[in-house]
Amino acid sequence: MRKKLFLFAITMACTVSSAFAQMSSNVNHLNFAVGALYERGLDATLSYEHETRYHHAWEYFLNGYIKWADDPDAGHVTRQSFWHNYFTYNIGIAYKPCVVRGRNHHGNLRIGISGGSDTEKIIGAAHLGYEHTYALRNGFQVFWQIKEDVVLRGEDQFRTGVALGVKLPL
């Protein structure tokens, strides 16, 4: 009896662990991130992420970036100088190979390209960064990113910064 119970427990443990391993691959997420970029920039990203094996992922994203300036008349940032200084929006794709794995977390490089506009001309961008994700209950995840964007034909050629976000399971 004891031997059968022991074999049953081992079988259940293997079944449950394989189910959890299967749950972490081929999962889709809707991501939302907000960040601050040097110098005087804010960034918001809405993306769809398809996770493949071993936490590698493909991300399809929409990105908006706003750069504010001091109002020359007031001497500080005003509503007008914040919202109407410089704005870009991009649509792009990023491949995210996993480089760090842990029990409830993993880290990915983020390599991507995008194209968009700054409301006056077409711009292109190359994206490189690191993203670290922490798993929560029910498939929810939170993450932070360190990002570097190289923008072609934009007002600011290099953007670097940090973003925080959440991943909602689909």
Regions found by a protein language model. Give the residues of each.
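Cleavable N-terminal export/targeting peptides
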Residues: 1-26, 170
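Generic detector of N-terminal low-structure segments
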Residues: 8-10, 145, 160
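Short glycine/proline- and aromatic-enriched beta-strand/turn motifs that initiate or cap beta-hairpins
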Residues: 21-66, 167-169
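Extracytoplasmic loops and strand-loop junctions of Gram-negative outer membrane beta-barrel proteins
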Residues: 27-32, 75-78, 113, 146-147
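Solvent-exposed loop/turn segments connecting transmembrane beta-strands
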Residues: 32-45, 85-87, 115-126, 150-159
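Gram-negative (and chloroplast) outer-membrane scaffold detector with strong preference
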Residues: 49-129, 134-142, 168
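Generic short beta-strand segments
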Residues: 64, 146-149
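Outer-membrane beta-barrel "beta-signal"
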Residues: 93, 157-170
